[in-house]
């Protein structure tokens, strides 16, 4: 779809959506997004130009269907997939991608750390994906030195980053905000550093006693991203890994640096979103969202959860969806899903499904709460179908039609029950929705009530 769009930009030194938006140009991607979001194209251009919205769209990801991440657009959901040295392979990861897209993932991150040739896995995922693909290039950089963190050089990072950009990655997590002077701030934490990429950079700095190479070479990364229109997803290496550590000095110090890096990227017309926690008590979620907006000049916020309690391994898609709904309501632009396997193991296909549906619920609830245009239309349609006992229409409108049909058919599987005016909860005699009050009956009742003395009490 994008081949002709991209061809017109050949030879441009900067091909980012922000670059064109700031020239007053509405790109084909912006126009496509405007139609998807039911928003004016000029509004999309303006939001991208000011940095409050991004359209992750690498010029080499030609089968991409452009989408937007920003407070003016619908709240989005990211799904993480990826092979590990101990589990999964290329075929399984492509299957997870297809499943994630089926259940509504707006973007997908390939977090592969092993399980085969990482370049082949990544390329297969990009070629199969209509949604933006994100990566964490530091993982492959570490693989390139056979896992010996101390051997990593700035050139190792830059080489892998450029390779990912050439392959068509739309956004990359860059852990440039964790500075050497922030490491002592984790001393009093319960869980220390819980970001994989952040942990790699921390160990490198502790060994070499040098500043974060992703920070010192940030301008070099900007130059790569300009050439391919890769968006920054600035990693929160010092995000809290438990309730105790939330909103501490380490987290907020890094956040200030992420804001500085955001504005540095904007100086060169490169798109940015900023990653956030993590594990946060419910009463601190609004503060975290507002603080990010303040420090990062309203760049889109992209949070992992956050989990609102730490005592539910196996159910962290629920503990985190609670926090995600609140974060979305307060203005977070994209939610990174958490699966039931979080903290326990690599998610399988069913875990991906359960995590995604939990997060689609959270994002949709946030859209309704923020009164986004048309956000409640589907709810109203499903409610009408429910009131009219149109079971097939209810299944069709559900976030997970297969699950809705499966649960209904567990007890009433025959086709005749698809038109029945009850389900197995209430049975044929006790369903309150069978009480149809027509307009004539209400008119008669109103006439009767009008004749009654005022102030009548029982």
From Swiss-Prot:
Binding annotation for substrate: 80, 109, 139, 175, 195-197, 236-239, 275, 302
Keywords: 4Fe-4S, Iron, Iron-sulfur, Lyase, Metal-binding, S-adenosyl-L-methionine, Thiamine biosynthesis, Zinc
Gene3D superfamilies attached to this UniProt entry: 6.10.250.620, Radical SAM ThiC family, central domain (3.20.20.540)
Presence of keyword DNA-binding: no
Cofactor: [4Fe-4S] cluster
EC number in record: 4.1.99.17
Positions bound to Zn(2+): 279, 343
Any one cellular-component term (Gene Ontology): cytosol
Catalytic activity: 5-amino-1-(5-phospho-beta-D-ribosyl)imidazole + S-adenosyl-L-methionine = 4-amino-2-methyl-5-(phosphooxymethyl)pyrimidine + CO + 5'-deoxyadenosine + formate + L-methionine + 3 H(+)
Cofactor: binding comment: Binds 1 [4Fe-4S] cluster per subunit. The cluster is coordinated with 3 cysteines and an exchangeable S-adenosyl-L-methionine.
Pfam families according to UniProt: ThiC_Rad_SAM (PF01964)
Pathway the protein contributes to: Cofactor biosynthesis; thiamine diphosphate biosynthesis
Binding site for [4Fe-4S] cluster: 423, 426, 431
GO biological process, alphabetically ordered: thiamine biosynthetic process; thiamine diphosphate biosynthetic process
GO molecular function, one term: zinc ion binding
HAMAP family: ThiC (MF_00089)
Similarity section: Belongs to the ThiC family.
Known function: Catalyzes the synthesis of the hydroxymethylpyrimidine phosphate (HMP-P) moiety of thiamine from aminoimidazole ribotide (AIR) in a radical S-adenosyl-L-methionine (SAM)-dependent reaction.
Listed name of the protein: Phosphomethylpyrimidine synthase
Species of the source: Cyanothece sp. (strain PCC 7425 / ATCC 29141)
Primary gene name: thiC
């Amino acid at each position: 779809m994008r081949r002709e769009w991209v061809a017109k930009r050949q030879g441009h030194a900067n091909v980012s959506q922000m670059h064109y938006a700031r020239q007053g140009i509405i790109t084909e991607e912006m126009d496509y997004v405007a139609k998807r979001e039911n928003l004016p194209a000029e509004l999309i251009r303006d939001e991208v130009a000011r940095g409050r919205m991004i359209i992750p769209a690498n010029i080499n990801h030609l089968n991409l269907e452009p989408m937007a991440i920003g407070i003016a657009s619908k709240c989005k959901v990211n799904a993480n997939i990826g092979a590990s040295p101990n589990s999964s392979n290329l075929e399984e990861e492509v299957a997870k991608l297809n499943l994630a897209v089926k259940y509504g993932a707006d973007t997908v991150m390939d977090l592969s750390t092993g399980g085969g040739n990482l370049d082949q896995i990544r390329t297969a995922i990009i070629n199969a994906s209509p949604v933006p693909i994100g990566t964490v290039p530091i993982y492959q950089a570490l693989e390139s030195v056979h896992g010996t963190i101390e051997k990593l050089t700035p050139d190792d990072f830059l080489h892998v980053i450029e390779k990912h950009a050439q392959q068509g990655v739309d956004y990359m997590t860059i852990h440039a905000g964790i500075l050497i002077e922030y490491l002592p701030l984790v001393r009093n934490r319960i869980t220390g550093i819980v970001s994989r990429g952040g942990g790699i950079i921390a160990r490198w700095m502790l060994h070499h006693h040098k500043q974060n190479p992703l920070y010192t070479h940030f301008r070099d990364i900007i130059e790569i991203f300009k050439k391919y229109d890769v968006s920054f997803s600035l990693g929160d290496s010092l995000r809290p890994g438990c309730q105790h550590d939330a909103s501490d000095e380490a987290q907020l110090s890094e956040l200030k640096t992420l804001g500085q890096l955001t504005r540095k990227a904007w100086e060169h017309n490169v798109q940015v979103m900023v990653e956030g926690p993590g594990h946060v008590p419910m009463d601190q979620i609004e503060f975290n969202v507002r603080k990010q907006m303040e420090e990062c000049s309203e760049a889109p916020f992209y949070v992992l959860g956050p989990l609102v309690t730490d005592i539910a391994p196996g159910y962290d898609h629920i503990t985190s969806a609670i926090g995600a709904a609140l974060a979305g309501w307060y203005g977070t632009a994209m939610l990174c899903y958490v699966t039931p396997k979080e903290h326990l193991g690599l998610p399988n296909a069913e875990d991906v499904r359960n995590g995604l549906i939990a997060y689609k619920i959270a994002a949709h609830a946030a859209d309704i709460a923020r009164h986004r245009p048309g956000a409640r239309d589907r709810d109203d349609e499903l409610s009408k179908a429910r009131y009219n006992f149109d079971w097939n229409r209810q299944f069709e409108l559900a976030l997970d039609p297969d699950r809705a049909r499966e649960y209904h058919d567990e007890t009433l599987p025959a086709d005749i029950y698809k038109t029945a005016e009850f389900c197995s909860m209430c049975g044929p005699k006790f369903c309150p929705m069978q009480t149809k009050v027509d307009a004539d009956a209400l008119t008669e009742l109103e006439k009767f009530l009008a004749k009654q003395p005022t102030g009548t009490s029982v």
